[in-house]
Design a protein with these regions (language model features):
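Bacterial N-terminal signal peptides that target proteins for export
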Residues: 1-20
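A non-catalytic, amphipathic alpha-helix used as a structural packing/dimerization or gating element
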Residues: 42-46, 50-53, 117-120, 124
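A short small-residue
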Residues: 27-32, 98-106
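Short N-terminal segments immediately surrounding and downstream of signal-peptide cleavage
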Residues: 28-49
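Boundary at the C-terminal end of the N-terminal hydrophobic targeting segment
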Residues: 21-26
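Acidic/histidine-rich alpha-helical segments that form the ligand environment
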Residues: 105-153
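Short, contiguous alpha-helical
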Residues: 41-45, 52, 61-102, 137-178
Length: 178
């Protein structure tokens, strides 16, 4: 009987030692938490990439409106880019771009012009986040979060433009197998 108890104790000790080693290994392998600027940059770039994919993917009918009272597809993208520059001009203390709430269509006549303006606003935002680092991002954290959310809200609006046009938004399409 003592032999059985001893065997059980040895086995239990080995199991516990292996569990402790596995737990320690898992803790060592866990990635470091993101810094504030890394988290803001990741979110900014994620929604920016989604918007740019939509902007590139949308047919050339950039004047399409859900209803007569709403902005056109182009105007939504211009509004996003202009708002991005409103933020960037304030946090950087310099005029980085056209920060009007609704830049006029006449200033951005083609799909390529609109996409380039949107892309530049997103790229400039990412560069500003990196330049500011954690201290700068934390100083303007409410702004960065608010404007990133603003991009996300308009992304959702553009999904409605896709659906109303019987199109499937890029992020809702089946993933291509590799």
């Amino acid at each position: 009987m003592i032999r059985i108890v001893r065997s059980i104790l040895v086995f239990a000790t080995l199991v516990l030692a292996n569990l402790a080693a596995a737990s320690l290994h898992a803790q060592e392998a866990a990635p470091a938490p993101k810094t504030p600027s890394q988290a803001v940059l990741e979110n900014w770039n994620d929604i920016g990439k989604r918007l740019l994919t939509m902007a590139d993917d949308w047919p050339d009918n950039y004047s399409y409106k859900l209803t007569p009272a709403t902005r056109s597809f182009s105007q939504v993208l211009l509004h996003i880019a202009g708002s991005n520059y409103d933020l960037l001009n304030r946090v950087s203390g310099t005029k980085m771009g056209d920060g009007r709430n609704d830049p006029p269509d006449a200033d951005y006549k083609t799909k390529a012009d609109v996409v380039a303006f949107l892309k530049k606003s997103i790229d400039d935002g990412a560069a500003e986040i990196q330049k500011e680092g954690d201290a700068g991002v934390l100083k303007h954290l409410d702004d960065w979060i608010g404007y990133t959310e603003h991009m996300g809200e308009h992304y959702g609006l553009l999904v409605a433009y896709y659906r109303a046009s019987n199109l499937v938004p890029p992020s809702s399409r089946p993933k291509k197998s590799q």
